[in-house]
Amino acid sequence: MLKCQNMVLKISGRKFIRFLKPRITFQTNTTRLQPFQNATWRVQVPKREMVTLIVATTYDPASINPATVLLAMPGWTTGPTLPPNIKSFTNQQTRLIQHDVSIVKEDDLDSRWEEATGEVVDEVIFLSRHTAVSNRPALTVHPIGVLHLKEGESPPHGGKAGWAGLTNPRIGPWLRLLKKMAEAHSLVPEFEITLEGTHHGPLTSKPTMFLEIGSTEEYWKRQDAAHVIALLIWEGLGLGGGEPVGNWNSETGKRKVLLGIGGGHYAPRHMDIVLKDDIWVGHLLSGYSLPMEEAKPGESHIGGTWRQSIQSAFEATKASFPGGEILAHLDQKSFKGWQKKAITEFLAEQNINVGRPNDFT
């Protein structure tokens, strides 16, 4: 027995004593210890594991169905409960959490998971339904944020006014993989495979993307669509033993990242570029995310929150792709002359490079 100040330490034939969080190792060459003689103290802070967080909700069949298919695949075990009562499941470095409310209403799930488990969340992937006026069946991928709203305005579908989430680098590579999988499972041409512009919440602090099934209840419940989304995650994260798809590394491969500006919600002209191999995707600002008020006669100032949107989108995209080459791609035909002039001048002022389609090859 060793007395160290007011602390009694027991030794059972071991040559070291460990304390965790942080771990303190006391090493000696004998089991009968003389206080602090011939001993070394070493502080070791345990490594925190990096994990992918997948979020599903029982509130939505287009969310829980793919999650259920995914959980039926090998390797899953029950994980800890996230307060107040959110179930979790674990498979290698992947965590799937399942709650019971709207997918856009549970904020800060990444930081809440870190606080509860001590793990570090590397990215967040939400499973959700998609709605559209056209009611067309679709499988969609998109970043999140509510960049164009003014401070004090209340976003209708989660997030925070003026906020741009970090974009998940997997968006581009997974869109291309999703298209191949959907074709292989005969979902195309019935289902459109597409990007969506940046929109809605919830709040996160880690690189995030949404995978959605649309666009009506009939399609939200489609098991073949749920199966393809589950396979996308399974293969995309390498859970089956293959190489993960879409891990960002500025040291290898192409580094060009598309920042989409303008166009409709489904970003068709940006899509044409993103479907090329090795193109990465940052924020996608549809026309509604770029409110512009034409200057009054005799004035030059163009009002609206479009500058805020572009700047926030650029900064978030840049932070999501360290070492990347961010190129703004404008949907030229979606702007009036005065709008295009104002945007290109602002991009130049902000030192944001503009890329034409051929610049992404």
What feature does the model see in each segment?
Residues 7-9:
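N-terminal low-complexity segments that are often proline-rich with Ser/Thr-Pro
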Residues 11-20, 24, 29-205, 216-217, ...:
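N-terminal catalytic or cofactor-binding beta/alpha core of small enzyme domains
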Residues 274-292:
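Acidic, Ser/Thr-rich peripheral helices and adjacent loops at domain boundaries
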